[in-house]
Regions:
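Active-site-adjacent betaalpha module
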Residues: 2-106
Length: 106
């Protein structure tokens, strides 16, 4: 039922673009919208999320992370995200802001 099929393991566009790779960063492959194993991860002081779709996967995981780690700084780089439509992208960003998730590069 995905409105836009994306990030399907092993297909073109699944890997992190070389320009976005950060040395020492942790990359997590998740099988569905919201990943339920965040609590098993160790984070120093901040998490930055990017990806497709802002209004499905990004917002789901940002909210899960905020619930699991309420004091951890969680940032979403809006310039590295896209929604199904421009309006749903914007709505997802607003939802995350209301839940104390930092949005940069709008």
């Amino acid at each position: 039922k995905l409105p836009v099929e994306h990030c399907i393991y092993g297909t073109h566009g699944w890997q992190i673009a070389e320009e976005l790779e950060v040395e020492g960063a942790t990359y997590i492959d998740k099988p569905t919208f919201g990943w339920s194993h965040w609590e098993e991860q160790k984070f120093d002081n901040e998490i930055e999320l990017i990806g497709l779709c802002t209004d499905i996967c990004v917002v789901s995981n940002a909210l899960i992370l905020k619930a699991v780690f309420p004091e951890l700084k969680i940032t979403v780089d809006a310039s590295c995200c896209a929604g199904v439509t421009p309006q749903t992208h914007k709505s997802a960003l607003e939802t995350m802001k209301m839940c104390q998730i930092d949005i940069i590069n709008e």
